UniProtKB/Swiss-Prot annotation:
The gene is P/C. Keywords: Coiled coil, Phosphoprotein, Viral RNA replication. It comes from Human parainfluenza 1 virus (strain CI-14/83). Residues 479-568 are annotated as: Interaction with the nucleocapsid (N-RNA). Residues 412-445 are annotated as: L protein binding. Residues 344-411 are annotated as: Multimerization. Signal peptide: none annotated. This is Phosphoprotein. The N-terminus consists of a long intrinsically disordered tail. The central part contains the coiled-coil multimerization domain (PMD). Forms a four-stranded coiled coil structure. The C-terminus constitutes the alpha-helical domain that binds to the nucleocapsid (N-RNA complex). It comes from the Viruses. Residues 179-216, 441-450 have a biased composition (Polar residues). InterPro entries: Paramyxo_PProtein_C (IPR002693), PProtein_oligomer_dom1 (IPR043097), RNA_pol_Pprot-P_XD_paramyxovir (IPR016075). Homotetramer. Interacts (via multimerization domain) with polymerase L; this interaction forms the polymerase complex. Interacts (via N-terminus) with N0; this interaction allows P to chaperon N0 before encapsidation and form the N-P complex. Interacts (via C-terminus) with N-RNA template; this interaction positions the polymerase on the template.
């Protein structure tokens, strides 16, 4: 917190309370002394110098510019200020020793942080700005008014230790002067002193008690040498890398190598020194850090300078590679593998692609790589063709097996058909040879074996009638005789009445005879009776089923009783 700013904030209250002005000022000064000092043990000390600053801040300037009449007044004010400063000198020295030790500890911490973080491209204003912003609240009020003189012993030490600074810079340490803080920047000082641009020399940080405000010419020369050191080291590293490149590239001529060196030196001047890429270093591995730094610079320069000769060599070899590709395409066309050169250029097969790359390759390494790729692609394509042939052979074998089965079935079916054909031919031969007759083959009269459809003389069926027995026109057996044939064991006594011949044929019935007149006569009697049709059928059935004469007699008695009942 600034004294002037605090006082001007309290100014309207002081104007409103004019009689209590001195009391309010003393209270404000006491508060400032408590806040700004670390250990305010001497509060009851004389503060007349503070009263003089606040009441008439422009007194010193006006006394320097006044006339001879005002000289005594100016001398009196200066002596008062000097006495007050001498009286308060003891308290200031005690506070200064504490703040200086604390500032040096913080300075060492800042150096270690910078070494861990890596050196920045502009370390001086960064350290000054950060530390000034962090250390403003720790100021003591004595440092604003009374500025200390710069110690000369440290100037001599800094001039003597300029070579040590260069060593530190090579080893990766931050660019800071040993035993003191870095120099301040005018731009940041104006922004951070709360508008007091006229008082830039009066710094108010405890760390800047040892700052060199007026640097000697030796220090300036050392700083300039440090700033010019990095591009020279980069150039040395680049020249070394160029030598290694020129030793490795055997194909490049002397004129091309000189042009490449000029081009590389121009590009190296344009390349800014990269500080953030360098690794952070501690004090234990200084020697290793030098080696790693040198190798990283060489690697970066090689990465930046290598592509140009490779591009030139590839551009020179493209013409030769194209001619070789064309010759290969012509050879393939002449052998009959390809139809045209354009087809070889546009082919997407892996072996063709690797062949093109091998013909266009610039180094033996690329050539061997592409040759291996071509061989592997050819092997893979051959393996694929072998697998395809295996699958085709399997399919052909399956088709052959199925065709064999079909041939077997067809041959069996053909045998069956042949046997049937032979049988039919034999029957036809017999029919045509004999003429359809089963008699003697000596008969020459032949009848056709195939008959056309003609009108057949159908015999009309005539129902059995007992009157036809005398006529002899009975062709079919009557139902009664058929039923009796089914029961051969049971003999009807009526039928066997006058038939003593055991082997009488059915044809004997066609002859008119009187042997069986009893059965027929009884049937005729029953049919001519006035009974109903159902009763007639029942009596005829029962009559034919009789086994003995007594049964026939009983049936006829029942028939007579029925007729008597009807007539009566």
């Amino acid at each position: 917190m600034d004294q002037d700013a605090f006082f001007f904030e309290r100014d309207p209250e002081a104007e409103g309370e004019a009689p209590r002005k001195q009391e309010s000022l003393s209270d404000v000064i006491g508060l400032l002394d408590v806040v700004l000092s670390y250990k305010p043990t001497e509060i009851g000390e004389d503060r007349s110098w503070l009263h003089n600053i606040i009441d008439n801040p422009k007194e010193n300037k006006s006394s320097c510019k006044s006339d001879d009449n005002n000289k005594d007044r100016a001398i009196s004010t200066s002596t008062q200020d000097h006495r007050s400063s001498e009286e308060s000198g003891i308290s200031r020295r005690t506070g200064e020793s504490k703040t200086e030790t604390h500032a040096r500890i913080l300075d060492q911490q800042g150096i270690h942080r910078a070494s861990r973080r890596g050196t920045s491209p502009n370390p001086l204003p960064e350290n000054m700005g950060d530390e000034r912003n962090t250390r403003i609240d720790e100021d003591s009020p004595n440092e604003r008014r009374h500025q200390r003189s710069v110690p000369t012993d440290e100037d001599r030490k800094m001039a003597e230790n300029s070579n040590k600074r260069e060593e530190d810079q090579v080893e990766g340490f931050p660019e800071e002067v040993r035993g003191s803080t870095s120099l301040s920047d005018d731009g940041e000082g104006r922004t951070n002193n709360n508008g007091r641009s006229m008082e830039t020399s009066s710094t108010h940080s405890t760390r800047i008690t040892d700052v060199i405000t007026n640097p000697s010419p030796e220090l300036e020369e050392a700083v300039l040498q440090r700033k010019k050191r990095r591009p020279t080291t980069i150039k040395r590293n680049q020249t070394r890398s160029e030598r290694t490149q020129n030793s490795e590239l055997h194909k490049s001529t002397s004129g091309d190598s000189s042009n490449l060196e000029d081009h590389n030196t121009k590009t190296s001047q344009k390349i800014p020194p990269s500080k953030n890429e360098e690794p952070a270093v501690t004090q234990k591995n200084n020697h290793n850090h030098r080696k790693t730094k040198h190798t990283t610079n060489n690697a970066n320069n090689n990465a930046k300078c290598l592509p140009t000769p490779e591009h030139d060599t590839t551009s020179n070899e493209e013409g030769t590679s194209n001619t070789s590709v064309d010759e290969m395409a012509k050879l393939l066309v002449s052998l009959g593998v390809m139809k045209s050169q354009h087809e070889f250029e546009l082919s997407r097969r892996a072996s063709h692609q690797f062949a093109k790359r091998m013909l266009k390759s610039a180094n033996y390494k690329e050539m061997t790589f592409n040759l291996c790729g071509m061989l592997l692609s050819v092997e893979k394509s051959l393996g694929n063709k072998v697998e395809e042939n295996r699958t085709l052979l399997k399919q052909i074998q399956e088709e052959i097996d199925s065709s064999r089965d079909l041939h077997k079935r067809f041959s069996e079916y053909q045998k069956e058909q042949n046997s049937l054909m032979m049988a039919n031919l034999s029957t036809l031969h017999i029919i045509t040879d004999r003429g359809g007759k089963t008699g003697d083959p000596s008969d020459t009269t032949r009848s056709p074996s195939v008959f056309t459809k003609g009108k057949d003389n159908k015999v009309k069926k005539t129902r059995f009638d007992p009157s036809m027995e005398a006529l002899g026109g009975q062709e079919f057996k009557p139902d009664l005789i058929r039923e009796d044939e089914l029961r051969e064991d049971i003999r009807n006594p009526v039928l066997e009445e006058h038939n003593n011949e055991p082997q009488a044929s059915n044809a004997s019935r066609l002859i008119p005879s009187t042997e069986k007149h009893t059965l027929h006569s009884l049937k005729l009697v029953i049919e001519n009776s006035p009974l109903s049709r159902v009763e007639k059928k029942a009596y005829i059935k029962s009559l034919y089923k009789c086994r003995t004469n007594q049964e026939v007699k009983n049936v006829m008695e029942l028939f007579e009783e029925d007729i008597d009942s009807l007539t009566n």
